[in-house]
Amino acid sequence: MPGLAAASPAPSDSQEKKPLKPCCACPETKKARDACIIEKGEEHCGHLIEAHKECMRALGFKI
């Protein structure tokens, strides 16, 4: 039984991390960026846009 319990969580953890899509990455920075763009316009949200790009890069996305 210990082998079964140890084997089950490992594959699901690695499977969940590998197929991370850009749309699902960095939800906090994405939400703040989008809200700012809608309310103030893109030209006033450069700092939030950059923060989201940095978060995406940290997760391995090439932006």
UniProtKB/Swiss-Prot annotation:
<dbReference type="GO" id="GO:0008284">
    <property type="term" value="P:positive regulation of cell population proliferation"/>
</dbReference>
<comment type="function">
    <text>Copper metallochaperone essential for the assembly of the mitochondrial respiratory chain complex IV (CIV), also known as cytochrome c oxidase. Binds two copper ions and delivers them to the metallochaperone SCO1 which transports the copper ions to the Cu(A) site on the cytochrome c oxidase subunit II (MT-CO2/COX2).</text>
</comment>
<keyword id="KW-0143">Chaperone</keyword>
<feature type="disulfide bond">
    <location>
        <begin position="36"/>
        <end position="45"/>
    </location>
</feature>
<dbReference type="GO" id="GO:0008047">
    <property type="term" value="F:enzyme activator activity"/>
</dbReference>
<feature type="modified residue" description="N6-acetyllysine">
    <location>
        <position position="18"/>
    </location>
</feature>
<feature type="region of interest" description="Disordered">
    <location>
        <begin position="1"/>
        <end position="21"/>
    </location>
</feature>
<dbReference type="GO" id="GO:1903136">
    <property type="term" value="F:cuprous ion binding"/>
</dbReference>
<feature type="binding site">
    <location>
        <position position="24"/>
    </location>
    <ligand>
        <name>Cu cation</name>
    </ligand>
</feature>
<feature type="binding site">
    <location>
        <position position="23"/>
    </location>
    <ligand>
        <name>Cu cation</name>
    </ligand>
</feature>
<dbReference type="GO" id="GO:0016531">
    <property type="term" value="F:copper chaperone activity"/>
</dbReference>
<dbReference type="GO" id="GO:0005758">
    <property type="term" value="C:mitochondrial intermembrane space"/>
</dbReference>
<feature type="short sequence motif" description="Cx9C motif 1">
    <location>
        <begin position="26"/>
        <end position="36"/>
    </location>
</feature>
<dbReference type="InterPro" id="IPR007745">
    <property type="entry name" value="Cyt_c_oxidase_Cu-chaperone"/>
</dbReference>
<feature type="short sequence motif" description="Cx9C motif 2">
    <location>
        <begin position="45"/>
        <end position="55"/>
    </location>
</feature>
<dbReference type="GO" id="GO:0033617">
    <property type="term" value="P:mitochondrial cytochrome c oxidase assembly"/>
</dbReference>
<comment type="similarity">
    <text>Belongs to the COX17 family.</text>
</comment>
<feature type="domain" description="CHCH">
    <location>
        <begin position="23"/>
        <end position="63"/>
    </location>
</feature>
<keyword id="KW-0479">Metal-binding</keyword>
<feature type="disulfide bond">
    <location>
        <begin position="26"/>
        <end position="55"/>
    </location>
</feature>
<keyword id="KW-0597">Phosphoprotein</keyword>
<keyword id="KW-1015">Disulfide bond</keyword>
<keyword id="KW-0963">Cytoplasm</keyword>
<protein>
    <recommendedName>
        <fullName>Cytochrome c oxidase copper chaperone</fullName>
    </recommendedName>
</protein>
<feature type="modified residue" description="N6-acetyllysine">
    <location>
        <position position="30"/>
    </location>
</feature>
<keyword id="KW-0496">Mitochondrion</keyword>
<comment type="subunit">
    <text>Interacts with COA1. Interacts with the chaperone CHCHD4; this is important for correct folding and the formation of disulfide bonds that stabilize the structure.</text>
</comment>
<keyword id="KW-0007">Acetylation</keyword>
<dbReference type="InterPro" id="IPR009069">
    <property type="entry name" value="Cys_alpha_HP_mot_SF"/>
</dbReference>
<feature type="modified residue" description="Phosphoserine">
    <location>
        <position position="14"/>
    </location>
</feature>
<dbReference type="Pfam" id="PF05051">
    <property type="entry name" value="COX17"/>
</dbReference>
<keyword id="KW-0186">Copper</keyword>
